[in-house]
Amino acid sequence: MYDTIVIGAGQAGISIGYYLKQSDQKFIILDKSHEVGESWKDRYDSLVLFTSRMYSSLPGMHLEGEKHGFPSKNEIVAYLKKYVKKFEIPIQLRTEVISVLKIKNYFLIKTNREEYQTKNLVIATGPFHTPNIPSISKDLSDNINQLHSSQYKNSKQLAYGNVLVVGGGNSGAQIAVELSKERVTYLACSNKLVYFPLMIGKRSIFWWFDKLGVLHASHTSIVGKFIQKKGDPVFGHELKHAIKQKEIILKKRVIAAKQNEIIFKDSSTLEVNNIIWATGFRNPLCWINIKGVLDQEGRIIHHRGVSPVEGLYFIGLPWQHKRGSALLQGVGNDAEYIVKQMNGE
């Protein structure tokens, strides 16, 4: 019987592990990956974080390098591995959770390896779990090369011809800019694009967000509600420049598909050769067989990561408490709070 089991060894789960190591708890982190940092390693080759190194560290250990510079995905992978080794955080890899049950005052976790029992359970699988691909993708011809942004590594995966990137978030923006240098590239967005600079006066924009209190705005505050309503901006002006130079052709929201053709909200159409769905992720928790975890719309019920189900906690959710909860730097604050709640502090 463990005191605590954490499911997920990404930055959120590792942050929980950091604070659990400072307590007397017997705990372990389970993850289906083959190595620490695998979810970062599997992202596209050119991925660079839009948060500076100063805001890309977990508690207790800074990310090395120029603090206002922007780390690559490989830096983050190496950092996470070094972090786990330094703090001797117990992780069992290649362990996929099949189901979770609540039996009286403990949780029963069934995996592909064995069963585990624990008094406390922390779900740290995060929001980037299962690719969210629109159902209209099934209406396209098999001749169309389709990838989700989580599957995209580089342009070598694409077939000859044009590419449509669907989704105007930061991943979609970076991928579209990269591909526009070698082929005809379209970008379909549901909303008007808003751009923020990466740097202001030789400092990362997140330094300014920090000083202005934006990173510390709770999800229930006036500032927090405003930011959530507006959504995240595109950081950097590379996309804006590429659109202005007509290197990327901006399209309206995708509403339908038929064989080789995509139909947009303004009724225009486009014959495509490749599509990259930069349409985000969903986090299905069908393996948690416990009443009271989700509301009627399938959303996680929690207050700052604490579930109404006794002993159950969540970490790594967008806006779990503050704007900064989604950042490497911010997840540590949520982890510290959860472990304190767990210990009755």
Curated annotation (Swiss-Prot):
The keyword Zinc applies. GO terms for cellular component: plasma membrane. Its EC number is 1.-.-.-. Pfam families: Pyr_redox_3. It is an enzyme of class 1 (oxidoreductase). GO terms for molecular function: flavin adenine dinucleotide binding; monooxygenase activity; NADP binding. This is Uncharacterized oxidoreductase CzcO. Involved in potassium and divalent cation transport. Enhances the transport activity of the cation/potassium transporter CzcD. It is a peripheral membrane protein. Keywords: Cadmium, Cell membrane, Cobalt, Cobalt transport, Ion transport, Membrane, Oxidoreductase, Potassium, Potassium transport, Transport, Zinc, Zinc transport. It is found in: Cell membrane. InterPro entries: Auxin_biosynth/cation_transpt, FAD/NAD-bd_sf, Flavin_mOase. Gene3D superfamilies: FAD/NAD(P)-binding domain. The gene is czcO. One of its GO terms (biological process) is zinc ion transport. The keyword Membrane applies. It comes from Bacillus subtilis (strain 168).
